[in-house]
Amino acid sequence: MAKKFREKLRKFNPFTRPMTLDELPKPLPANPDQRLVRVYVEGYEDVAFWRGIFDHFQNPYMRFEISVPNRADLPKGKKVLMGMIPRSSDELILCVDSDFDFLFADRTEQSREVNNARYMFHTYAYATENFLCYAPSLHNVCVKATKNDTRIFDFVRFMHEYSCTIYPLFLWYAYSAQLSSENVFPLIDFKSAVRIGYLDLADNGEKTLEWLRRNVAKREEMLRKRNPKMIEPMKEFEEQLRGRGLTPENAYLFMHGHTLMDNVVMILLNSVCEKLRAMSIAKITASKKQGVALKNEMANYTNSLRSIRDVLLDNENYTKCPLYKRLQRDIEKYIARTIWNMKRSGAIRDDSTWTVLRNMRQGSEIK
């Protein structure tokens, strides 16, 4: 009896046993007029982000398919993709987090390799999480999570002040990172120094910022006392980073992405969304509805709520970020170059040169 029951379970749930390749769903037939471009990313969590990026670049001649590297040992990570640079081409491109490679320019071997790779695209911001946490987009995250559009907190102003506050420690952390052999200010210390443990909504989080300023000042003073010989070299280092676009106001876009998301932005969002939900519930309970009608109204509202983290991970309202604009231009140049080469090689036969140019222009207008 138990054996028959297990057999029935297998029929209803194919995941009770490993499926063979022959049993897996087959991909839909591709458009023969479009060239398939394989886009490899660092990990599974990056697939959705880069899918959202390349959705802005649809055109009649190329189709992008996003995935982790397709190898039997299922490798993942930036190092794996960097090992694939020699294989990259018009039909195989690589997308990675910049980490510090953009800011460091040619100061390290890895930054030179990333910045000079013809078919590798990087975020310019430290990681994809920094785009998701782009300050002007955070109010919309609250609206989608709570279904309440009331503005009770200025995310842009707070993140401006936060970024300026942590800027001195960011310089120490970045300087320590580019030394590679010296553990002056490692990530674990940077993370503990720039995290916010709470948000006091009064005066747009000013008390929280004051608390952070005190912590940052203490840590900076300690670093200067411990490493007096690094103070002058750091001034030159700062000028070089500013030449790459770093400012006190946008430092949060270049800091460690998971630290920003988990220890700063999620603290803000949880606090703000809690208040917005409470406001909506208070409005419902203060209404004239009673009994079953009130209960149904409350259920309708609570059922419409979404996980704050899930909404943040789905956030795509970062397209006005200047760093995204740089990534956008890189991809546009690659697409224009590839389509032009396809036309010259005869891969695009039916469309005239003017038609190709018009289609490319229309594709850019979609963005």
Each model region followed by its residue ranges:
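Acidic, divalent-metal-binding catalytic cores of TOPRIM
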Residues: 2-367
